[in-house]
Amino acid sequence: MLPFLPEPSLSYTQQNRTAVLLLNLGTPDAPTAQAVRPYLKSFLTDRRVVELPKWLWYPILHGLVLTLRPKKSAHAYEKIWFKEGSPLEVYTARQAAALAKRMPDLIVRHAMTYGNPSVADVLSELKAQGAGRLLVIPMYPQYAASSSGAAVDKVCEQLLLQRNQMSVRTVSRFYDDTGYIDAMKNHILRYWAEHGRGKKLMLSFHGVPQKHYDLGDPYPDECRHTAKLLAEALELTEDQYVVSFQSQFGRAKWVTPSTQDLFGKLPKQGVTELDVFCPGFLADCLETMEEIALMGREQFYEAGGKSYRYIPCLNDNPDWIDALVALAEENLGGWR
């Protein structure tokens, strides 16, 4: 077996196009246990995601997690699945299409760290189209080793297989980007104008294990910085918003406060009207549509809440597309 992938039948002068790759986490191909299992396996065997020795983690993963979780996750996916497919895939594809329309001189594609469209397939297609330069934008405003780091790893794995390697730039983070903050501000204000406004705004980010933070992962700090900038843009006082972290799994300690815990505590503290927005998610997905919009509502009402509004992610919001164009232009530099 050859150590490198075959190169496209293009001369070196034909491999001078510039491509932009929007890279998101991933999704199963269908809302079924059969489709969820391989997706979970690829996700949960990544050492960036679960930092445990294989001898300890793999028996748990194969003996329990991959036996029990696929059916449960498939049921959750069924609740939020679109006719066109997974919401995460649909919205990320729309973002890429909108960016391509605004930057017609570039090749713009999207891929998933886990699942389809795979990084391997998309990079192969980009090379065949003559892309010699690649700007990778992991769709995570706040850097975490388990998300942004894992995404860049996938690209680097493919570079190791290329005989004629592409020139690559990556956008590691944009948690304080003015366009991103303004897009969220405008999006939330429009939502409030149309649907009304609760007494408190919860800004819920995906969680990470506390150990990751203790070992130097900047993610929680960047999340809190984003929340502060967004709150200032919305002219909120400190008692009008709260920052939390969701989607914990396993027995390890995770960064706090927990979104799920706050759903139970806030009504008892007199907060019965709550709006929830997830700044770290640029496209709606299982963690926002099922965990927050559906399950979060149930948890909040069961604890005594009276009004609950989930504010959708930016998705293909025009203001966000404007910000994404500006972000790409800034990082492309002399490549355009």
Curated annotation (Swiss-Prot):
Binding site residues for Fe cation? H206, E287
* Keywords noted in UniProt: Cytoplasm, Heme biosynthesis, Iron, Lyase, Metal-binding, Porphyrin biosynthesis
A GO cellular component annotated for this chain's UniProt record is:
cytoplasm
Q: What is the annotated localization of this protein?
A: Cytoplasm
Q: Which GO terms describe its biological process?
A: heme biosynthetic process
Q: What is its main location?
A: cytoplasm
One Gene Ontology term of the molecular function aspect: ferrochelatase activity
Q: What is its EC number?
A: 4.98.1.1
The answer to keyword Cytoplasm applying to this record is yes
Enzymatic class: lyase
Task: Please report a single Pfam family linked to this protein.
Answer: Ferrochelatase
This protein's record includes keyword Cytoplasm: yes
Coiled-coil ranges (or none):
none
* Known catalytic reactions: heme b + 2 H(+) = protoporphyrin IX + Fe(2+)
Pathway(s) per entry: Porphyrin-containing compound metabolism; protoheme biosynthesis; protoheme from protoporphyrin-IX: step 1/1
Record CDD domains: Ferrochelatase_C, Ferrochelatase_N
Spell out the NCBIfam families in the cross-references. hemH (TIGR00109)
**Function of this protein?**
Catalyzes the ferrous insertion into protoporphyrin IX.
Family that this chain belongs to: Belongs to the ferrochelatase family.
* Name of the protein this chain belongs to: Ferrochelatase
* Gene expressing this chain: hemH
